[in-house]
């Protein structure tokens, strides 16, 4: 078996590593660097440049020099974050026919995975040059909070680059592997704070060592898939543009060439301010007007930069609290804090993280290389070169289906260890229903419409039967890459439908955070809604069973009783259409009171007919065996 290489496909920089014996080794690219800028350029003469060569020519070719493509991968063009990038990126972001965010390069439409594949090809070539043999397999890292669409798109990029992606691994988890593999750490709980070029993750990970085997178990994860160093750069660029406009009266935003020079200068200044208290942004001949050439010379202090980005740093703190809460831990339970991603070199970030955890982050983990090293370790685990390592990752949000009453019924709860598989039996809502719609949801709210829709499919060909009798088994299966597969099977007919969730749009961080915040803020209203739906379902069941008993009783039921029952049934039916739980319960009680004679007749029939008895008990027991949360009938118009 050949080597499985580990690739950190980053927003700003990428890195490749391999297992060399028992040690992971980060490889230098053709330019002699251990990291490669995730920049791709398409030149006028048709050449494709990747990495440093692409970065060097960006000033003269801004429209066709693509960077931070990871922020677009697996996203919809109409996403708020994408629209924000449309207005600030020098290259052209367009909407594809399927609604995804694509790019227009010299009149050619290109998908983000297609462009990211160029970076992966360079990583592949770097490994092949070092090993002297072809490389066909890789472990690629993604932010822990990447959703299905983004993970799928990353795998697609690997395939386009000629790589079989053996595993998608979360970046903080990879960093934990890099940190914990060669250390005698014993049993420890660590927090991995990963602030990269375009994404932010926090993972709480427990490392256990038993008889020489190390288990890396992710307890909880949280984050923001649209927060990173690029946002810090943008704040500084906007400040410099505004200062220049105040001084010279010229808005550089209308000059792509000037903006590209400014981007490079801002990134350089930001890096310098991590070690210096102030720096000069000096750009001669940045632009010109009728009076002649204009030069930029602006002094920027560390304090100024910190004031520009303070809210971005603070945005990363809230997910830390949620992750700890989900893990059931407090800050005092964390033994070590690991910083990953280039943006964590900023002193303000280090200070805020240290203040939150009450301890200094460790300095013995290289923030640029740890993720690629961890990916290589995982590759070694898959080939068998690395032994006695077990990695247990989690899914970041609950997954379930929409059931009767518009309820989200979870099959897999958030922070469940993956891979995992869970099945549950549901039934039909109406007599002789021949099809159901399986509507797959992701989120934390009780009301189905408050969650993110991942897709839906129909299961047809259900044999005619009374409501509640068919048994439909729904199975959710999340693989080790965090990708969801859903199946629905009619246990009677054996008919089955399956889908892999390949949503072209996925959850962005703000949507996820909003779901979690809404779930917390609306816990009480969610609880009341859930109780209302349960009462409605009980009332609905009572309605159907009473009508059936009236029909079976026939002439044995006195006319007065029948009239009273019909009246109570109509009153309950009206109450079920409302939102008042107490009113439904009252009407159910009234129906029970006027149905006493009916109950007596039913009991007599029960005693007299053994065959009827068996049928009745099966009918009454159905709700014990089947979850009382049912599908709406599939209408033809769907």
From Swiss-Prot:
Residues that bear Phosphothreonine: 199
Key words, A-Z: ATP-binding, Chaperone, Nucleotide-binding, Phosphoprotein, Stress response
InterPro entries assigned: ATPase_NBD (IPR043129), Chaperone_DnaK (IPR012725), Heat_shock_70_CS (IPR018181), HSP70_C_sf (IPR029048), HSP70_peptide-bd_sf (IPR029047), Hsp_70_fam (IPR013126)
Keyword Chaperone tagged: yes
Gene3D superfamilies linked: 1.20.1270.10, 3.30.420.40, Actin, Chain A, domain 4 (3.90.640.10), Substrate Binding Domain Of DNAk, Chain A, domain 1 (2.60.34.10)
Induction: By stress conditions e.g. heat shock.
SUPFAM superfamilies membership: Actin-like ATPase domain, Heat shock protein 70kD (HSP70), C-terminal subdomain, Heat shock protein 70kD (HSP70), peptide-binding domain
Pfam family, one: HSP70
Keyword ATP-binding (UniProt): yes
Biased composition (Low complexity): 604-620
Entry GO MF terms: ATP binding; ATP-dependent protein folding chaperone; unfolded protein binding
PROSITE patterns to which the protein is assigned, alphabetical: HSP70_1, HSP70_2, HSP70_3
Region (Disordered): 604-638
Cited function: Acts as a chaperone.
Cross-referenced PANTHER family: HEAT SHOCK PROTEIN 70KDA (PTHR19375)
Recorded family membership: Belongs to the heat shock protein 70 family.
NCBIfam families: PRK00290.1 (NF001413), PRK05183.1 (NF003520), prok_dnaK (TIGR02350)
Name of the protein in its database record: Chaperone protein DnaK
Organism of origin: Salmonella choleraesuis (strain SC-B67)
Taxonomic lineage from the root: Bacteria, Pseudomonadati, Pseudomonadota, Gammaproteobacteria, Enterobacterales
């Amino acid at each position: 078996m050949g080597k499985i290489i580990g690739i950190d496909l980053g927003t700003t920089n990428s890195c490749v590593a391999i297992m060399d014996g028992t040690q992971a080794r980060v490889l230098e690219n053709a330019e002699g660097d251990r990291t490669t800028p995730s920049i791709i350029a398409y030149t006028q003469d048709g050449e494709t440049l990747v990495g440093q060569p692409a970065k060097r020519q960006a000033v003269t070719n801004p429209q066709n020099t693509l960077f931070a493509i990871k922020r677009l991968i697996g996203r919809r063009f109409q996403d708020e974050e994408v629209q924000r990038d449309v207005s600030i990126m020098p290259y052209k972001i367009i909407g594809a026919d399927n609604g995804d965010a694509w790019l227009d390069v010299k009149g050619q439409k290109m998908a983000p995975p297609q462009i990211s594949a160029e970076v992966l090809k360079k990583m592949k070539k770097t490994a092949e040059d070092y090993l002297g043999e072809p490389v066909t397999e890789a472990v690629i890292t993604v932010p822990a909070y990447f959703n299905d669409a983004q993970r799928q798109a990353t795998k697609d990029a690997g395939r386009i680059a000629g790589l079989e992606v053996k595993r998608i691994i979360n970046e903080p988890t990879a960093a934990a592997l890099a940190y914990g593999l060669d250390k005698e750490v014993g049993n420890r709980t660590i927090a991995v704070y990963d602030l990269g070029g375009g994404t932010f993750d926090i993972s709480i990970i427990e490392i256990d060592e038993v008889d020489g085997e190390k288990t890396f178990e992710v307890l909880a994860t949280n984050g923001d898939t649209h927060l990173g160093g690029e946002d810090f750069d943008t704040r500084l660029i906007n400040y410099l543009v505004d200062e220049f406009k105040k001084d010279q009266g010229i808005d550089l935003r209308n000059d792509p060439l000037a903006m590209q020079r400014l981007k490079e200068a801002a990134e350089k200044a930001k890096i310098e301010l991590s070690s210096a208290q102030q720096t000069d942004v000096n750009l001669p001949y940045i632009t010109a007007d009728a009076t002649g050439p204009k030069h930029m010379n602006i002094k920027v202090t560390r304090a100024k930069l910190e004031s520009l980005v303070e809210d971005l740093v603070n945005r990363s703190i809230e997910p830390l609290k949620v992750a700890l809460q989900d893990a059931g831990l407090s800050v005092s339970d964390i033994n070590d804090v690991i910083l990953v991603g280039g943006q964590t070199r900023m002193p303000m970030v280090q200070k805020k993280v240290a203040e939150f955890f009450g301890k200094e982050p460790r300095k013995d983990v290289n923030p640029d290389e740890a993720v690629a090293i961890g990916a290589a370790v995982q590759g070694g685990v898959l080939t068998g070169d690395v032994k006695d390592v077990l990695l247990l990752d989690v899914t970041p949000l609950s997954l379930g289906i929409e059931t009767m009453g518009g309820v989200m019924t979870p099959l897999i709860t958030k922070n469940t260890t993956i891979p995992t598989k869970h099945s549950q039996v549901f039934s039909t809502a109406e007599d002789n229903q021949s099809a159901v719609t399986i509507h797959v949801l992701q989120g934390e709210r009780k009301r189905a419409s408050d969650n993110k829709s991942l897709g839906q499919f129909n299961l047809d060909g259900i044999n005619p039967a009374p409501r509640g009798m068919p048994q439909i088994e729904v199975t959710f299966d999340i693989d080790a890459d965090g990708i969801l597969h859903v199946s629905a099977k009619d246990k009677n007919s054996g008919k089955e439908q399956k889908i892999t969730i390949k949503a072209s749009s996925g959850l962005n961080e703000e949507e996820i955070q909003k779901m979690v915040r809404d779930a917390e803020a609306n816990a009480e209203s969610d609880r009341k809604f859930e109780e209302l739906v349960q009462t409605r379902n009980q009332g609905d069941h009572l309605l159907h069973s009473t009508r059936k008993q009236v029909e079976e009783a026939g002439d044995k039921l006195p006319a007065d009783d029948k009239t009273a029952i019909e009246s109570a049934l109509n009153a309950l039916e009206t109450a079920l259409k409302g939102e008042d739980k107490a009113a439904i319960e009252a009407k159910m009680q009234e129906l029970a009171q006027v149905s006493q004679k009916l109950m007596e007749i039913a009991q007599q029939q029960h005693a007299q007919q053994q065959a009827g008895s068996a049928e009745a008990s099966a009918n009454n027991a159905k709700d014990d065996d089947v979850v009382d949360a049912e599908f709406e009938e599939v209408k033809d118009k769907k």
